[in-house]
A protein has these predicted regions:
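N-terminal Rossmann-like dinucleotide-binding module
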Residues: 1-42
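A residue-level signal for conserved active-site and pocket-lining positions in enzyme catalytic cores
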Residues: 7, 29, 52, 82, ...
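Short beta->alpha connector loops
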Residues: 8-11, 63-66, 87-90
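Donor/substrate-binding cores of folate-linked one-carbon enzymes
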Residues: 21-22, 32, 81-200, 207
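Conserved beta-strand segments of alpha/beta enzyme cores
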Residues: 25, 56-58, 102
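N-terminal glycine-/serine-/threonine-rich beta1-alpha1-beta2 phosphate-ribose binding loop
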Residues: 36-78
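Acyl-group handling in specialized metabolite and lipid biosynthesis
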Residues: 202-215
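An anion-binding loop in the catalytic cleft
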Residues: 213-304
Length: 304
């Protein structure tokens, strides 16, 4: 079975590694064009391109599939199936129609919940206890195709979005392998999504960073976890702006105004929330290094 793989970030690279390891006939790898990265702004390969090159797989990096020449190039690869994982491009119908066995996708949520570009981040932001990955057929509408299979996993109470993604990548790779096996031997089945239950997970942006201490301590904790590793939660304190990477829920309560500093323990800085108390464990002052909160405030004492 001839497979074309399409993907770009780390989760996709994990999936590509898996199907290489399993010995599928991969006739082409599509990934986004090289982009400038870091302060030097040198062009950098995507994680998927790195994997493809390491295994001598042909790499294609079109900006889009608007040109007929680009579509024909894919057609000439004669794929039986196209496997898509976080490619970052919407595929037009003329591309979806090319592989005889369809275009499949691994999506990092339990569809129809959290359609969109930031599903695992929103699962953490919303305080979900469980999420997973879904294998589905691609259609013209975003993340709305028929579902083939799912795999579930609990979300740890202190787990960040980045940590969750690392686990979902492994889960997704296993599900992709299982799905391709089912397609190859003709046993795969699918069911339509219940579109009435669809929810959406739009891309995060830096306007969402500031912590709202009028919310409950649990909501603040979820916010910090969901925004880690990007774009990272922030707070203002004593005229300075801090990035906040790690927090802990405390069992105590407080009648102080939300955002009030209650004290500094050996573990972190304690602040009042709309309900409950949150402890800031790891932070980074603007222009400074990421460090444990007690270490920072020993060198920069607060007036409590």
């Amino acid at each position: 079975m001839r497979v074309v793989f399409m993907g770009t970030p780390d989760i996709a690279a994990t999936c590509l590694n898996k199907i290489i390891e399993k010995g599928y006939e991969i006739v082409g790898v599509y990934t986004q064009p090289d982009r400038p990265k870091n302060r030097g702004m040198k062009l950098a390969f995507s994680p998927v391109k790195e994997v493809a090159i390491a295994h001598d797989l042909p790499v294609f990096q079109p900006e889009n599939f608007r040109e007929e020449e680009t579509v024909e190039q894919l057609r000439q690869l004669k794929p039986d199936v196209v496997a898509v994982v976080a490619y970052g491009r919407i595929l037009p119908q003329k591309v979806l129609d090319i592989p005889e066995k369809g275009c499949i996708n691994i999506h990092a949520s339990l569809l129809p919940a959290y359609r969109g570009s930031a599903p695992y981040q929103w699962a953490v932001l919303d305080g979900l206890k469980e999420t997973g990955v879904t294998a589905m057929y691609l259609c013209r509408e975003m993340d709305a195709g028929d579902m083939i299979d799912t795999a579930k996993t609990p979300i740890g109470e202190n787990e960040t979005a980045g940590e969750l993604l690392d686990r979902l990548a492994v889960l997704g790779a296993e599900l992709l392998d299982k799905t391709l096996q089912g397609i190859e031997d003709g046993t795969v089945q699918s069911v339509p999504q219940d579109h009435s239950k669809a929810t959406y997970a739009p891309m995060l942006d830096k306007t969402m960073c500031p912590i709202d201490f009028t919310k409950t301590a649990q909501q603040v904790h979820n916010h910090v976890r969901g925004m880690n590793p990007w774009p990272v939660a922030t707070m203002e304190l004593a005229g300075k702006r801090f990035k906040v990477y790690e927090t802990a829920l405390l069992s105590q309560s407080s009648t102080a105004a939300p955002g009030t500093v209650l004290g500094l323990s050996k573990q972190g800085l304690q602040l009042a929330c709309g309900e409950g108390v949150i402890e800031i464990r790891v932070l980074q002052a603007e222009g400074g290094k990421r460090m444990a909160a007690p270490d920072y405030f020993r060198g920069h004492p607060l007036e409590l």
